[in-house]
C-alpha cells in the first residue's frame, strides 16, 4: 500500500476520523471531533492473533460514526518497508474488509512514536509506565497530522 495525502475529490466530508498506531503488541487509537479540528486519545487495544483487535476498532468506528480511518504506516527512516510495515498494511486490510464503506488511508508515521515518547519524557512520564499512553499519543500525532494536512488541502 502507498501512503496517501488528503484529496478533496475523495474526502468524505464532515465527520469523525479515527487514527491508528498499529504495533505488534498494542494499537493506539485516537479520534477527531466531527469538524476535524482536534485529535484526542481514545484507548490502547491489545494486539491479538485472532481478530479481537480488529473487532474492537470496528466497534469504536460504529459507536462514533467514523467516516474515515487513518492508519500509520511504519516505514524505515530510509523509506524502505519492514515487517512492521507489512503488519500495519495487513491490519488496515482486515479493518477495510469489515468496514467496506469507510475509506482507510495509510499515512507515513515515521517518527510518530518517537515524538510521542519524547513528549512523555519531557513531561516526566516514564516510558515503561506510560507505554499504553505513548501508543495513544502516537495515534493522536498520526491523526492530527492528517487533519492539519486535510484542512490545508480543502482550503
UniProtKB/Swiss-Prot annotation:
Domain of life: Bacteria
EC number: 3.1.-.-
Function description: Could be a nuclease involved in processing of the 5'-end of pre-16S rRNA.
Gene3D superfamilies for this protein: YqgF/RNase H-like domain
BP terms from Gene Ontology: rRNA 5'-end processing
Family: Belongs to the YqgF nuclease family.
Species whose genome carries this gene: Corynebacterium jeikeium (strain K411)
Protein name, as recorded: Putative pre-16S rRNA nuclease
One Pfam family from the record: RuvX
SUPFAM superfamilies (alphabetical): Ribonuclease H-like (SSF53098)
Main location: cytoplasm
Swiss-Prot/TrEMBL keywords: Cytoplasm, Hydrolase, Nuclease, Ribosome biogenesis
UniProt enzyme class: hydrolase
InterPro entries: RNaseH-like_sf, YqgF, YqgF/RNaseH-like_dom, YqgF/RNaseH-like_dom_sf
Entry-linked SMART domains: YqgFc (SM00732)
Amino acid at each position: 500500500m502507498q501512503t496517501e495525502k488528503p484529496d478533496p475529490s475523495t474526502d468524505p466530508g464532515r465527520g469523525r476520523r479515527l487514527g491508528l498506531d498499529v504495533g505488534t503488541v498494542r494499537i493506539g487509537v485516537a479520534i477527531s471531533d466531527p469538524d476535524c479540528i482536534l485529535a484526542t486519545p481514545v484507548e490502547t487495544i491489545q494486539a491479538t492473533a485472532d481478530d479481537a483487535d480488529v473487532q474492537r476498532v470496528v466497534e469504536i468506528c460504529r459507536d462514533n460514526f467514523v467516516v474515515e480511518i487513518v492508519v500509520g504506516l511504519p516505514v524505515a527512516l530510509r523509506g524502505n518497508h519492514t515487517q512492521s510495515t507489512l503488519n500495519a498494511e495487513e491490519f488496515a486490510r482486515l479493518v477495510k474488509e469489515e468496514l467496506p464503506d469507510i475509506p482507510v488511508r495509510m499515512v507515513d508515521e515515521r517518527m510518530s512514536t518517537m515524538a510521542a515518547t519524547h513528549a512523555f519524557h519531557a513531561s516526566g512520564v516514564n516510558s515503561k509506565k506510560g507505554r499504553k499512553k505513548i501508543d495513544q499519543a502516537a495515534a493522536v500525532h498520526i491523526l492530527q497530522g492528517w487533519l492539519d494536512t486535510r484542512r490545508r488541502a480543502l482550503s
